[in-house]
Amino acid sequence: MATSLFRIDLPEGHHIVGDERAGDDPCYVFLHGLGSVRAGEKSASLLDHAQHRDRGFLRFDMRGHGESSGELGQVTVSELIDDAIRVLERTGPAVVVGSSLGGLVAAHAAAARPDLCERLALLAPAFGLMPNIRRQLGQDGFLHTSDGPSFFVAPRVRDDAEALDERGLPARVRVPTLVVHGTADDTIPLQVSEWFHAGVAHASKELWVVADGDHRLNTVATEIWRRVDALTTDVKP
């Protein structure tokens, strides 16, 4: 399952680092969650899925994570969305898979550039987290995550998060969409995925509620890939 490293240089000396596998289109693109990195259990499973189908695959560390530049808590969500679009411009129309914060970023990127997203899979997407970010912070301004490091959230990041138009987002998503959420997720409530799915403006959409599924959803990854591949792309939004 060999992949090759790549780097995308950004303005002001920033950069994104990832790895990719050459293969047939559409490529699978994976966006990880907050405090995570590109090389995780789900992305490894998706890479294996891509290899068995001789399809392209790409994953990258979002800024503030892993080998990419920036510090956690210092990069705005709007910047992460712009970065994701830059990556998709590299691959062309892709099957975009986002987990948690990566799901939120993927949804915004798909809404902004539907021409670059053939299908969209959102795994426990972090809807509701950003508009209410100040409620999540401690008095010291730190965000305490369930499975990652605690970190200070810069004022510009808070302001950007609160300004995101999340309420109108579902209606702007006009691509085939799979939303997956577990009933035992103690990080992001199931209700936000139900709300998002109901508003998606494409006829080919599915909400899969995983009984006893946690926030990571690692145990059902193989079925997730099957379901996103099964989404119909030849129907009108």
Which residues does each PLM region occupy?
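The alpha/beta-hydrolase serine catalytic core
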Residues: 16, 111, 116-237
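Short beta-strand element of the alpha/beta-hydrolase
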Residues: 25-33
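Conserved alpha/beta-hydrolase
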Residues: 47-69
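Catalytic nucleophile-loop/oxyanion-hole region of alpha/beta-hydrolase
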Residues: 65-91
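Alpha/beta-hydrolase fold nucleophile elbow
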Residues: 91-99
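Gly/Ala-rich beta-loop-alpha elbow adjacent to hydrolase catalytic centers
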Residues: 98-106
